Amino acid sequence: KREKVVIFGNDYPTPDGTAIRDYIHVSDLADIHVKAAEHLVTNQQSNILNCGYGRGVSVKDVLEIANAVNNKPIQTEMGSRRAGDAAMLVSNVSKLHQLLDWKPKHNDLSFIIKTAIEWERKLMENENA
């Protein structure tokens, strides 16, 4: 529904100047939550875990993949950095893998974006029905 996506900053100390983030598929995130709950019940021990794939992707790269998956260009606008935004946020997932023996099922950004777009389209169809 948005006319364009705002890229907040292109002057970060990253290869393309945009922020880098660790994106995760919602199904993998849900799987982690289930495994964490099972671990808590079994071991009676809570932990703090980083959820992600342990690799970062720039905002520009995400939009390039989204354009390819969507078969339609997403309009973008360059904006200023937001206060407090870090140049790079990538999860250290070693504890997650060690403690929960978790392995990602959807560790492909094209698939993550494709399923997100499909979900949004389904929501819009239901909204317009």
Predicted regions and their residues:
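C-terminal substrate-binding subdomain of Rossmann-fold SDR/epimerase-dehydratase oxidoreductases
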Residues: 2-129
